[in-house]
């Protein structure tokens, strides 16, 4: 009987949860859910100088916002340092590791010699079989793995296939530094083993680490977990992903108005495919996810495709869900628009009423919020340049003549205001647009908006007429 699937996401808290890390977390989450297993979260905080609480908070918040829940408590690698030291000492006792007293100067000379000879720098094993009694006085040694020197180290990778390294090219790596702190290589192996990880899914920049870590597993007599090294994400131009391409923190995507479900859907298709299907519900992703369907070449990040997919998710979302999502981005996007960081009951009600018209064109929540400007714009409305153009010439007099017809309406709705404006345009012998366009500009301050009669209905009689009177008095 096979053991239950356990995956892990193990970010270093030296910065935000970037988009590549988010995809790695998603793939681990999907694989665990696909097989009814568990995904664990480990914070690799052994770099004490660069690890920050703010970065830890950003990672956890980003995971929660994306809807990627983890099983059990968060595991902090630094807190397990004593266990890592214990394992290093056990390797020493079994003869699978040894004390190395090479000085910093000696190591630097090894690197320099290797460069001069045109080969990769590697430790030359000078303390591998040397008698410890020859140790120089007052020098604290490191502990190195006694790695195999002949044959090959092989990793059967679910994405990369069979990958081999000649053992002569892999030197005796450091397990424990001279100050007693464990190295990343040792800590990862011990933590993955103790956590019961059965499947490692991570970026292919860790592929060489897989060889090193496999050697540690075998020296300890532990089972090596299955491996899957996924290709990195590049920009649309094929270059290494940078901020201009979209190498941003997950919180930046949130604040730019992307829906978590849309971002999940976009990320799952970066490197993984399932036929020609582009749009996946979470349930469909889980049911279909397969490591063998991940390609080996770098995926390309395309903002245009992400925006298009996000727009689709916006159009298909319930109005109340979108209003809640707007409230999430208000702390970041509200103040610059003169909005509070949370919705007032009145504005929430107006947004709900306006949402059917607002969401048809928006590709992001920020666009949606900007389209809703007319709902929260202070009076008298400031006009953009195109709106000013629409209100030039005969437009003000037409609106002045229209005003009594609107004031006389017994019932105020999209249908009744449309009938009144159409009737007025016919009586004046002009096209509907010659009245509706200036009316839109007067009511919203913009040349584009949701359908103008929907705007009038959402604003209500008093607000709509007051804005029209403001413009006529200007």
UniProtKB/Swiss-Prot annotation:
GO MF terms, alphabetically ordered: ATP binding; glutamate-tRNA ligase activity; tRNA binding; zinc ion binding
Entry GO terms, CC: cytosol
Enzyme Commission number(s) of this protein: 6.1.1.17
Reaction(s) catalysed (UniProt annotation): tRNA(Glu) + L-glutamate + ATP = L-glutamyl-tRNA(Glu) + AMP + diphosphate
Basic and acidic residues bias (residue ranges): 113-133
Localization (cell): Cytoplasm
Recorded coiled-coil stretches: none
Motif ('KMSKS' region): 240-244
The entry's keywords: Aminoacyl-tRNA synthetase, ATP-binding, Cytoplasm, Ligase, Nucleotide-binding, Protein biosynthesis
Main subcellular location of this protein, as a coarse class: cytoplasm
InterPro entries associated with the record: aa-tRNA-synth_I_cd-bd, aa-tRNA-synth_I_codon-bd_sub2, aa-tRNA-synth_I_CS, aa_tRNA-synth_I_cd-bd_sf, Glu-tRNA-ligase_bac/mito, Glu/Gln-tRNA-synth, Glu/Gln-tRNA-synth_Ib_cat-dom, GluQ/Sye
Binding site for ATP: 243
Region (Disordered): 113-140
GO biological process, one term: glutamyl-tRNA aminoacylation
Pfam families, per database record: Anticodon_2 (PF19269), tRNA-synt_1c (PF00749)
Superkingdom per UniProt: Bacteria
Free-text function comment from the UniProt entry: Catalyzes the attachment of glutamate to tRNA(Glu) in a two-step reaction: glutamate is first activated by ATP to form Glu-AMP and then transferred to the acceptor end of tRNA(Glu).
NCBIfam families on file: gltX_bact (TIGR00464)
Assembly notes: Monomer.
HAMAP family hit by this protein: Glu_tRNA_synth_type1
Family that this chain belongs to: Belongs to the class-I aminoacyl-tRNA synthetase family. Glutamate--tRNA ligase type 1 subfamily.
Protein name as annotated: Glutamate--tRNA ligase 1
Species of provenance: Methylorubrum populi (strain ATCC BAA-705 / NCIMB 13946 / BJ001)
